[in-house]
Swiss-Prot record:
InterPro entries: AB_hydrolase_fold, Galactose-bd-like_sf, Pept_S15_Xpro, PepX_N_dom, PepX_N_dom_sf, Xaa-Pro-like_dom, Xaa-Pro_dipept_C. Its EC number is 3.4.14.11. The gene is pepX. Homodimer. One of its GO terms (molecular function) is dipeptidyl-peptidase activity. It comes from Lactobacillus delbrueckii subsp. lactis. One of its GO terms (biological process) is proteolysis. Removes N-terminal dipeptides sequentially from polypeptides having unsubstituted N-termini provided that the penultimate residue is proline. Optimum pH is 7.0. This is Xaa-Pro dipeptidyl-peptidase. Its main location: cytoplasm.
Length: 792
């Protein structure tokens, strides 16, 4: 598998020498050393676990130069050069590869090519040797990290602890901060919101992890993770809403309104600055933050309103949620008051903060980055938003239907608010408990699970309407197989952000609701180090030009990443597919006639006692038990690999034998073959140290799995009663044909030669839609039905 490397910044030999000297890797007297002496010293310096020169020299005999000679013996002959094969053997061992197991000592160059390592060459001068070691320190090792990070995990940079300054290597920040003395503290930011109705601004607990060096004169930037889960998670999955119920006439919709909570203006910060008096007991929940904390970036967490030890109530997705999370940044930049404790007597400032703030986090944590960025708050320089919701309607609803996130059937805005209302665990907070109970009733009514329609309530929770306020640079990360936060969320915000006068990037990986910072196939953590150094430390390191605007992981070969200028339907050419009465999906033949299927609701699924995931695979694979409740059409085999891009569109002319109905459409890759695992395989657990004795991550990647019959590419759902307007329902008569036109979730998917494309038209999606208790007949008029794809 290829260890692709995008974060290496091309560097001149002169600059490389300066950087090697600065980190004490290249000795000051290097010019007086012979080639063999320099080779011994530089190799030994990689071995950070050996703390004396004698210990380092003693370990050289552990490394083979070829299948007959160890490095110590090789150096006894005082060589003045080393061949590409000899150096490759030493380098591969330094990078963590095992000779005779991972590669052959007689052919190390093949191993280097296999893993996409920089090419090895004959070295005949000290200058070449020095620069080659510079490149080696910046090369990804077997554990996925660059060799310099492996050395850091062994203690190399402890020699710089206490110096109180940032150090850089190849444009990235180095772990020179004393992680054994990280300051861990809690402060209480006062909000302008009074969501619990006690007449006082809500106090928002904020947890700070920062380098001890920031206690003196050093100002450090902050990485802020807005995490509603930080105070704890209330497990309420057993009380999720019932989805085994019949559909409701959507014309009962009343357009529920958003109602703002009262404001209580907080006092302006005074000159008082008392050190924090509460120690943090919470732990960082995000590995990238820990990695960068060792490199000088403070890590800040807050769940804001409704979180443990604080005031207020959770109001999922609301403007109040955005305001409260934004107020933490206002404290970091000196524009908002915070106190040492809940008595509100002593103010404390983020005097350690440089005023430059970046944001990190996945899912809800990524969502709040979007929300805060739209406010244009001062000090927020960049966001790295992973698997983020850009419209809460698109998370819990779709085209007039209640549609759950994957594996979250029955969850909704009220239930998520309860999950995050961790101050309910503070037994004495009776004010919050009373306000929470009232808010739960309001959320239940306003979210309108009966009709699933768009409303003012949902409009207030659509961040895409406020993108003009974004002033910070932008990175979005999303899984193309994320059926929790469906890809429409990132696709639609990307169409807005890419047009703004800010630097923006997009990463699309093959995962579900997952992080990508520790994949074999891409050096994402190094890219983020480079990015945050540029954005928060204001170092010109070429980060803006270092990698393509859009990077997309291939679904056939996980170690292939596609560089694109954009992610949109117009990357491809439009192709029209027409379903026919004999089950074909044709590009030439118009379908005629009508086909009918009977939806069984959730009755058979309940009897089967299988998981929603198992149902989906059996369904798309065509098992008769489930396939009979659908219409299925297959294309001819593709003669050449074909990539589908952007958002497919469907037009379906359909009639139901009831006055309500829901229609689902899925595109499926058909053909028995190996496909990538649904989640990455862990190659080595805990093998990527964040710093010296400071936690670790695990190397992982998608790999070929056992052969399967089919794979879901994309799908979508629609309420038949929205045939006239996606935002307003209409009456539906039994037997009335209506024309539904809607887009499926966006994709970037390659069908290999020999594969077939399947179109499935059905109704109940057991994992996402409501599961009616009654059967319903759906008749599709093929003459009014078509699929529009965009193909590369």
């Amino acid at each position: 598998m290829k260890y692709n490397q995008y974060a290496y910044v091309e560097t001149s030999p002169e600059k490389a020498t300066e950087e090697l000297l600065a980190i004490n890797f290249l000795p000051e007297n290097y010019s007086s050393l012979s080639f063999s002496e320099l080779l011994a010293v530089l190799t030994g310096n990689v071995l950070a676990e050996a703390t004396t020169r004698q210990a380092k020299d003693a370990k050289l005999a552990e490394f083979a130069v070829d299948d007959q000679t160890d490095l110590a013996a090789f150096l006894l002959d005082t060589p003045t050069a080393i061949t590409a094969s000899q150096f490759a053997n030493v380098a591969l061992q330094l990078l963590g590869y095992h000779p005779n197991y991972d590669y052959s000592l007689t052919d190390p160059l093949t191993c280097g090519k296999k893993h996409a390592l920089p090419a090895f060459k004959d070295l005949t001068s000290k200058e070449e040797l020095i620069f080659t070691f510079y490149r080696l320190l910046n090369t990804r090792s077997k554990n996925g990290q660059i060799l310099l990070d492996v050395m850091a995990g062994k203690g190399y940079f402890t020699q710089f602890w206490g110096e109180g300054k940032f150090m850089f290597f190849n444009g990235k920040s180095l772990p020179v901060f004393d992680t054994s003395q990280v300051i861990r503290e809690v402060v209480y930011v006062q909000s302008d919101l009074d969501t619990d109705g006690d007449g006082k601004g809500d106090l928002l607990p904020v947890t700070v992890f920062r380098p001890v060096e920031s206690q003196d004169q050093l100002k450090v930037p902050a990485l802020y993770t807005a995490s509603p889960y930080f105070g704890g998670i209330i497990d309420n999955v057993k009380t999720n809403h019932n989805v085994d119920e019949n559909l409701t006439d959507a014309t009962t919709w009343t357009n529920p309104k958003y109602v703002a909570k009262p404001l209580v203006k907080s006092p302006a910060p005074s000159d008082q600055d008392v050190p924090a008096t509460e120690l943090a007991t919470g732990q960082s929940s995000y590995g990238l933050n820990e990695y960068l904390l060792a490199r000088g970036f403070a890590s800040v967490f807050s769940g804001a309103i409704g979180n443990r030890h604080g005031d207020g109530i959770r109001i999922t997705g609301s403007p109040e949620e955005t305001i409260s999370q934004k107020e933490v940044i206002e404290w970091l930049t000196g524009d908002r008051v915070a106190y040492t404790d809940r008595t509100r007597r002593f103010e404390t400032k983020a005097s350690w903060c440089s005023g430059n703030v970046g944001m990190t986090g996945r899912s809800y944590l990524g969502t709040l980055q979007i929300a805060i960025a739209t406010t244009g708050v001062k000090g927020l320089k960049t966001v790295v938003s992973e698997a983020a919701i850009s419209s809460w309607y698109d998370y819990y609803r779709e085209h007039g239907l209640v549609v759950a996130p994957s594996e979250c059937q029955g969850e909704d805005m009220d239930k998520l608010a309860e999950v995050c209302q961790s101050n309910l665990w503070d037994g004495g907070n009776f004010t919050a408990k009373k306000a929470y109970e009232a808010e739960q009733a309001e959320l239940l009514a306003a979210q309108d699970r009966a009709t699933g329609q768009y409303s003012d309530f949902w409009e207030s929770r659509n961040y895409r309407h406020h993108t003009d306020g974004i002033k910070c640079s932008w990175i979005s990360v999303h899984g193309l197989n994320d059926w929790n936060v469906k890809p429409k969320n990132v696709y639609k915000i990307w169409q807005k952000v890419k047009q703004l006068p800010v630097k923006s990037h997009l990463f699309l990986h093959q995962g579900p609701h997952y992080n990508m910072n520790n994949l074999v196939s891409i050096d994402f953590t190094d890219l983020m180090n480079l990015w945050f150094v540029h954005e928060l430390l204001e170092v010109e390191n070429g980060a803006y030009e270092q990698w393509p605007k859009v990077m997309i992981q291939d679904n056939l070969e996980a170690d292939e990443w596609h560089a694109e200028s954009d992610w949109a339907s117009d990357l491809g050419q439009a192709s029209l597919y027409l379903p026919t009465a004999d089950g074909d999906l044709s590009t030439v033949e118009n379908g005629t006639g009508q086909l009918t299927f009977t939806d069984l609701g959730g009755t058979e699924f309940k009897k089967a006692g299988i998981s929603e995931t198992d149902w989906e695979y059996q369904f798309i694979s065509g098992e008769e038990k489930w396939a009979k409740a659908s219409l299925r059409f297959e294309s001819e085999e593709f003669l050449h690999p074909t990539t589908l891009v952007g958002r497919p569109k469907v037009r379906v002319r359909v009639a139901a034998n009831k006055t309500v109905g829901q229609l689902s459409v899925a595109l499926v890759d058909l053909g028995t073959r190996q496909r990538l695992t649904a989640t990455p395989k862990i190659f080595a657990r805990g093998n990527q140290p964040f710093g010296y004795r400071f936690g670790a991550d695990s190397l992982q990647e998608f790999v070929p799995d056992k052969a399967t019959k089919a794979k879901l590419i994309t799908k979508a759902h629609m309420n038949l009663q929205n045939y006239q307007d996606m935002k307003q329902p209409s009456k539906l008569e039994a037997g009335q044909f209506v024309d539904l036109e809607f887009e499926l979730q966006p994709t970037y998917y390659t069908l290999p030669a020999g594969a077939k494309l399947g179109l499935i038209i059905y109704s109940t999606d057991q994992g996402m839609t409501k599961r009616p208790l009654e059967t319903e007949d759906y008749t599709v008029d093929l003459a009014g039905t078509a699929l529009l794809l965009y193909r590369k």
